[in-house]
Amino acid sequence: MIMNLNYREPIYLARYLKVMRDRLPSQFLISRSVSLDFNKDSPLPELWGLHDDAMKSFRGRMEFVSSMHDLPPPAVSSLLDLKVAIANKILENCHFCERRCGANRKKKRTGYCRLDAVSRYSAEFLHQGEEPELVPSHTIFFTGCNFRCAYCQNWDISQAPRSGIPILPQELARTITLRRAYGSRNVNFVTPTPHTHTILKILNALKVNVPVIWNSNMYYSREIAGLLEGVVDVYLGDMRYGNDECAKKYSNVPDYWNVVTRNFMKAYTGGEILLRQLVLPGHIECCTVPIVKWVKENIPKIRFNLMFQYRPTYRAYEHPEINRSLMPVEIQKALDIVREAGIEDVLI
């Protein structure tokens, strides 16, 4: 990790920092302390009704818990158990992401992400290359993706859904515990959306307090947004495109702007946000400008990471206009846009 002499500790990740230092419990531990009885075989609408009621108890408990000592013990049957049950049912008609393919992944049918019910990861390690406030970050790279980014730097992982190591939730929970003992500041789930069912099971088996990072393209369904509240501490979210046309052209994503802004708004009320804006060559006016404007007007109290790491990889050559690195003038223009907008908590 290269030291940034201009680095300032984030303003709007205050709760995360307290969880990281074991001064507050992670949200998933609070959910696991909320007791409720339910039948996992009940119809999905009935389970959602119970979930909505239990989330009211969760929110009240979140306000009450001001230290680790305030955390009640795990419930025999908990809100987190209910979240696991709901995610497991959604697998039968998959709508984890907003493509809403409807595949029965339990029967090995697949949708756009090409994943069945078995989650796999390609690597897990203490990552030193994330944002300074996150490192060392216990980063777990899941295989598969619901995007098809032409310039994906991890294309060998994202486009090979059947590669990697099959996940046994209890085993990975033990690995997370070990990494935490070795100094990880968080557990960082990368490309998590298609694996929501598995991640909830991992957290339900986890015994250690650790901040949960949802490292995502933010293109998940309303239902998944509801499950993530009460589980995720920091939404490490990409906001790449300022319009639907660019999203469709470079990532084959429909209705990008509505879905992603909706999910950022929901995350803003239920957790903390570290937003990544990867500046694309030739896309200052169409993407960076509207993103910065929207953030300032709608979710101003977030950590904003303006990123200049774009490199033309994978199939970027199919789009000559992005088959190059950023020019210095583009970098300076993006910096000026963010500064003039007055976004307060910026990482560059």
Show where each model-derived region lies.
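Short alpha-helix
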Residues: 327-338
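N-terminal alpha-helical interaction blocks
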Residues: 1-80, 86
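A cross-taxonomic marker for long C-terminal extensions/tails that follow the last structured domain
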Residues: 337-348
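Conserved acidic residues
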Residues: 95, 150, 233
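Conserved AdoMet/S-adenosylmethionine-binding subsite of the radical SAM
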Residues: 169-322, 328
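Long, charge-rich boundary regions
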Residues: 124-167, 175-194
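N-terminal [4Fe-4S]-dependent radical SAM core
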Residues: 60-142, 154-161
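Generic secondary-structure signature for well-ordered alpha-helical cores
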Residues: 99-102, 150, 154, 265, ...
